[in-house]
Structure formats: C-alpha cells, structure tokens
Amino acid sequence: MTQAHTATTVTTVSVDSLRQSARSHALPDDAAWRVDDVAALFALPFNDLLFRAQQVHREHFDANTVQLSTLLSIKTGGCEEDCGYCPQSAHHDAGVKAEKLMALDEVLDAARAAKANGATRFCMGAAWRSPKDRHLEPVMDMVREVKAMGLETCVTLGMLKAEQAQQLKEAGLDYYNHNLDTSPEFYGKIITTRTYQDRLDTIGHVRDAGINVCCGGIVGMGEAREARAGLIAQLANMDPYPESVPINNLVQVEGTPLAGTEALDPFEFVRTIAVARITMPRAMVRLSAGREAMDEALQALCFMAGANSIFYGEKLLTTGNPQADRDRALLARLDIRAEGYAG
C-alpha cells in the first residue's frame, strides 16, 4: 500500500493507558498505533492480555464460532523470489518441483470437497513473483466457478498491477492475500528480491479495486519481539486495516535458509494473536501455517486470544496442516461451531 493508502493521523496514547483498565480495549478507529504502543500490549501480563483480547473479540464476533478456510496450491514451485522461509523458491533446494497451473476441473473438485467438509472460504495460491496477463484468465475462471458454489474466494498470486487487480474484482474475487511477512526493519533479512514498498503497492492496488484485503505475516523467523510489534503496527495502521489477518508460525523446511531457526516460544505466538485482535478488532484473525506443530491446548489458547478462522485440510500449500477429522474433534471438545456448517 502506498503512503496514500496508509493512515497518517496519530492520536497520542500513553503506554500507561494501554496497561490500565481492560475496559479501554483498543484505540479509536482514527488513531495510529505506534510500535511502542503495540510493544506495550505484548508486554502485558499474559492473563491480562488474553482477557483484554477476549473482551475485544466478543464485542465484534461470536466467540464460539470460527470460519473454516481451505487453501489449495494451484501452481506449485519455481518461484523467482528468494523468501528465506519458502520451499517453493527456485533459489532453494527444498525438494519442491515446479508444476504447471492446475486445470480448472481439478480446482473445482477440490473446492467441492472443501465445501462438503465445512469450508466457507476457498483460497487459491500460485507460486509466482507476479502473474503474467496470460495466467490471469484461467485464474479468473477459477474464481467465477468457485464463487458460483457459494464459497468466499481468495487468491494469492504475488505482486499485482492496478489493472490486474481490477480484472480480478470484475471476476468476482472476494479477497486477495498479500502478506507483509514481517516489520520493515527485519524484512531485508528474509527477502531481497521484492521490496517492502512493492508489497504495500500491491495491497494498495487491491484496495483501490474494491477487493477485500487479506494481509498478515510470519513469526518465528528469528525476529525480536520489536519486529513482531512492528508488523502488527504496519497492519493496524492501514486505512482501513485488513479484513483478514493470517498469522503464520514458521514451518521450517530443510533446504530453506531458515531451517534450524530457534523456534518461537508458544506463548509468544499466542501473544501475537491477542495483540492482532486488540489492534484490529473487526478483522478475521486467521490461525494459519504452523498449526501442525501445535498441540490442542495451544490452539485453544489461540482461540481464546481472538483467532476466529483456521485453514482446514491436509495441506497448507506445501507444508502439513492438521487433518480435517482432528480439527472437527478439537472444535467439538471446545464447543466451537464452524461457521455455516451443520455436518
């Protein structure tokens, strides 16, 4: 998103006020979150932070309902970018082979299966730096057909030009995913082939086209808490902030530069979910990659912290995700309903 798309009005809020009463849950919508303000939320006692996040969550959502989303890799591997976490990068030897774009019928079969299993949102990801115009038409066909099934549609295709965003809007796309990944200061340690401003520009094109924005990041890449606070501040200060905020916990894949990175403390991941909920109270906060390594108690804490969507199914692009039966069993034990699912 360009500077024109970013909130610039700053309301002064003291760190002390952020620590005070749990009644003052979040800043007014016209305020901007300073990194120090977000860091102060991270530093709250764990129980206080979760209590505040749960209060904010209940003001805007049914705390016992989650949305189930399914993510399908429609074009895997061979990406020109050098993202240090990604096994689909052509720069890394992670054993992921480049594949062609999936056929429409295959995608629709996957979408039907996702809907039958309770998903209300179907996301399609392609490992491109940016789509060529000739690639966009088949993707738009996928969007039209999946939307006709009654599913929300989301795609993530890399960087977009303004006219490409407009074409996707005309095809009926509901959401476009383009993550910031981390804070501006830490970004260069993870990616060198695409600038932070490139990402902001694509988000700006998506917003200008009238498509809902899905934008979040990845934690556990060796960053300090300040970088996590910086990421949340960037997201929360978008005008408006994203409708969907996926929070990913790094999945370490052999052959990628980030393999062997010290794992993030699980409670710090929960704190990140809670801070995202407080700073972006009306967003769908999506518990995304990394759930395969989380036990049920940790996932339950994430729901308490304000996560209200999960990616559902056996694969999340090229890494593991808890199987659907396990997900349904966990939600049943927690008395959490899947949005729009009566199965």
Curated annotation (Swiss-Prot):
Keywords: 2Fe-2S, 4Fe-4S, Biotin biosynthesis, Iron, Iron-sulfur, Metal-binding, S-adenosyl-L-methionine, Transferase. It catalyses: (4R,5S)-dethiobiotin + (sulfur carrier)-SH + 2 reduced [2Fe-2S]-[ferredoxin] + 2 S-adenosyl-L-methionine = (sulfur carrier)-H + biotin + 2 5'-deoxyadenosine + 2 L-methionine + 2 oxidized [2Fe-2S]-[ferredoxin]. Pathway: Cofactor biosynthesis; biotin biosynthesis; biotin from 7,8-diaminononanoate: step 2/2. It is an enzyme of class 2 (transferase). [4Fe-4S] cluster binds at C79, C83, C86. Its cofactor is [4Fe-4S] cluster; [2Fe-2S] cluster. One of its GO terms (molecular function) is 4 iron, 4 sulfur cluster binding. Binds 1 [4Fe-4S] cluster. The cluster is coordinated with 3 cysteines and an exchangeable S-adenosyl-L-methionine. Binds 1 [2Fe-2S] cluster. The cluster is coordinated with 3 cysteines and 1 arginine. [2Fe-2S] cluster binds at C123, C154, C214, R286. Its EC number is 2.8.1.6. The keyword Iron-sulfur applies. One of its GO terms (biological process) is biotin biosynthetic process. The keyword DNA repair does not apply. Residues 64-291 form the Radical SAM core domain. Catalyzes the conversion of dethiobiotin (DTB) to biotin by the insertion of a sulfur atom into dethiobiotin via a radical-based mechanism. Belongs to the radical SAM superfamily. Biotin synthase family. NCBIfam families: bioB. Homodimer. PANTHER family: BIOTIN SYNTHASE, BIOTIN SYNTHASE, MITOCHONDRIAL. This is Biotin synthase.
